[in-house]
Each structure stands twice: as structure tokens, then as C-alpha cells.
């Protein structure tokens, strides 16, 4: 993008004690109007302690205020899919002692970041082995005038297929088509079946509060995952679209990822 992008990197307290040890990494994405330090400065200041408890390096990238973590088809200055899923991952693996394979990487986030985490994981399962979403904006079409989406994709009325394609739901239909007809209805091109998501390839964790304005689209995503026999965990709790909700939710996500990372290092 030809510009500096800031990130917060949180290391477990004992990172420096065993120089032979390699650590799994969790990429933690902020929501609309957030920035690289929103997670540690506002949402969950206890992330350093959490990283030490779970034994995970936590990386909080800047998502460009309202990038939705896309490579925008209308704004070349917004290429956050490439930045997070390729450039940042490569930089973190080169600078820190990481487990630099998909079995050592997870990605999650809240709101816009929940969308971004699932979107990137579905598009880059070779990079991320686990993913999550807290109150994620996983379907875009019901919100044609909100959160700068129109700036990134163009007006919905002019680009309905693009809005579908750039949503988590559209990426699910692409990655796990129920049949050829579902791909046709989604307006998605045919692809090599070998590129489709395999059962259990991604460990997926989704949660949303029952009073959240994204609750209905998260419930629909859960139902679509069930319909396509995609294993996942889905948690519903009382709560709204607030930092207080995500402060508690992130603890569950980090534990889910800890268990995933532990399974990945067990002898087969």
C-alpha cells in the first residue's frame, strides 16, 4: 500500500526464557473506526496476561479504520487482505520465533474484524488453521449504507454480486458449495474442487450476543455451516455490540485456539 502500518505485538512473559521454543500466533482484528491499539487500549487491556496464560503471541494490526480487511476493488490504497494475510504474516514469522505454519496460526476479531477474520481464513486456509468471529458483520447486503462498505465496494444497487462475493457468506458458498446450483445462485464461477475447503480443514469459533444487531446474520451463518456439514463451534450469550461483550468473548477465543494449537503438535 506504500504507507507505514502500525501493529501491536504482545509476547508471553516467558518468551525470552527458552530461546529454542517456537510460539503460535493469534491475529486479533479490530472493528470499524478502530486502530492497532484499540484491543489493548480499550477492549481488553489484560491481553498481555492472557497471552502468558495461553502461551500465544498476539498480533493486533491496524485495519485502516474501515477497510473491512479487503483488497478493495475500488480503492487501491486499501489492500488489507494482502497486508494481513501475506505481508504481515511473513514479517511476524521473520521477526519472532513463531510456529510458522497454518497449524501455528489463528485469526479472530470483533465486528468488522470478525468479518475480516473469517473472510481471510476462508480465502487463505493454507495460512490460518483456526479462525473466529465475535459479533462479526458476516453478511453485508442487509446494510447497504453502513460503515463505509459502499466506499470500499461501490454502491450495492450497482454491484450486488460484488457485495455477495466480498461477504463471509459469499466466501462460504465459494469454499463449500452445497452443489453446482448453489454456486450458480451465488453468481460465483466454477472452480477446481481441490481448491475448496475440506471438512475440518479450519477450526471455526463464532459467538454473538442475542441483543446484537448482527445476531440474525450470525445465526444464518451458523445455519449455513450446519447445512454444509462444516464443523464449528457457535456460542450465543446475552449481550450487545459492545467492548464489554468482546472483553469477555476474547478469553473464550484464546482458549479455543490454545486447544487447537495443542492438537496440532500432538504426534499423529
Q: Can you annotate each of these PLM segments?
A:
Residues 1-268:
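Non-catalytic cap/lid and distal C-terminal segments of serine-dependent acyl enzymes
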